[in-house]
Amino acid sequence: MLDPKYLRSEIDEAAARLATRGYVLDVAAVNALEEKRKDLQSRTQELQAERNARSKSIGEAARRGEDVAPLKAEVTKINDELETSKIELDALLTEIKSISDAIPNLPSETTPVGRDENDNVEVRRWGTPRQFTFPVRDHIDLGEAAKGVDFKNGVKLSGARFVVMKGQIARLHRALAQFMLDLHTLQHGYTECYVPYLVNPDSLYGTGQLPKFSQDLFNTGIEGEGEDEGKMRKFSLIPTSEVPLTNMARDEIFDEQELPIKMTAHSPCFRSEAGSYGRDTRGLIRMHQFDKVEMVQLVHPEKSWEALEEMAGHAEKVLQLLELPYRVMALATGDMGFCAAKTYDLEVWLPAQNTYREISSVSNCTDFQARRMQARVRIDGKPQLLHTLNGSGLAVGRTLVAVIENYQQEDGRIAIPAALQSYMGGLTHIG
């Protein structure tokens, strides 16, 4: 959520910056609502003051032995007007909040301006794609040949965009997650967390999935217990462990010396992939359920840009140790996620597609999520909104795809990257 004071005082500037994201802010409508809010709020306060004054006069008149019936009638009338004014004000504030909740974060000054992914800017690249001396096979062919990727049973059990992994491929998938967690906790200073996979609506609001992106979620509910008995408690499966990790800061005030707080978690992620019909229908690239190792940082508001570069480096280190070629892209304003002020995408080389594909997004959300969550840090004795950052470190399934394709051998076997062999019991090849 953007700063309401900024929106009120600099609405034209905000509209111009949001326009670079493709978001059209109706300045006239927002200004009209704001004027109406001020009028209604002023009217409500005047009625409250008038009611209090008349109520006081009733007591004084009664002490003098005067007839207070006319005064009571006036207070009743004022109360009716006040109640009507409060209802109108509450409805207006709800409307304003609904509009505010749909406004994305302001892009940073260093974010490339552009409409979509075609305007993303390459920042750097690492490694050289391997030159194969034999026909390249994709991860589906290689995984099925190794009897480790079973889409048939995935469809039977759940439907399209689900998979069953078996044997050494399942073990490699697990090894990748363990390797990533060890790297981030032992070398990068993150604290490993195990988080709930079901979260409540407040959590999804805090990190920006609700209300705008409800169609992307898998939702469920259970019968309440204790005080909630007889009520249905709403939950959603997490689209990323960013949601529970970041929301642990909700309604908290940290001391300055407690920051930065760096957390990581390995979890499944569940996404409906609404709007992705027909895209990546084969293989492991776009699934309804996939695993990811997530990184989250809660930082001092003056240090979030430094933290963004650091976090991108942490994600890159995974790819470097696995010796997978990649490039780093600065996303254009029109391609960024809702909460981000600036995002780097890491794209790994996939030989079978002869292109780079996204494997991580690392974003600085500035105070956008913190304002929704009221996550604050005490600076010079005064609570201020902290800054939140999140990034994949990495998407485990897509990393598995990259390893399978980049490490394929002419005989169909898959070599195990040196960094993973200790996690695979010394195994050097699959197949």
Curated annotation (Swiss-Prot):
The principal localisation class reads cytoplasm
What pathway does this protein act in? Answer: Aminoacyl-tRNA biosynthesis; selenocysteinyl-tRNA(Sec) biosynthesis; L-seryl-tRNA(Sec) from L-serine and tRNA(Sec): step 1/1
For whether the record's keyword set contains Methyltransferase, the answer is no
Please give the superkingdom of this protein's source. Answer: Bacteria
State one molecular function term (GO). serine-tRNA ligase activity
> Catalytic activity, per the record?
tRNA(Ser) + L-serine + ATP = L-seryl-tRNA(Ser) + AMP + diphosphate + H(+); tRNA(Sec) + L-serine + ATP = L-seryl-tRNA(Sec) + AMP + diphosphate + H(+)
Q: Where is this region: Disordered?
A: 41-66
Record flagged with keyword Nucleotide-binding = yes
Reported EC number(s) for this entry are 6.1.1.11
Location comes to: Cytoplasm
Similarity comment: Belongs to the class-II aminoacyl-tRNA synthetase family. Type-1 seryl-tRNA synthetase subfamily.
Please provide the record's free-text comment about the domains of this protein.
Answer: Consists of two distinct domains, a catalytic core and a N-terminal extension that is involved in tRNA binding.
Q: Which PANTHER family does the entry mention?
A: SERINE--TRNA LIGASE, SERYL-TRNA SYNTHETASE
- Protein's name in the database: Serine--tRNA ligase
Annotated source species: Aeromonas salmonicida (strain A449)
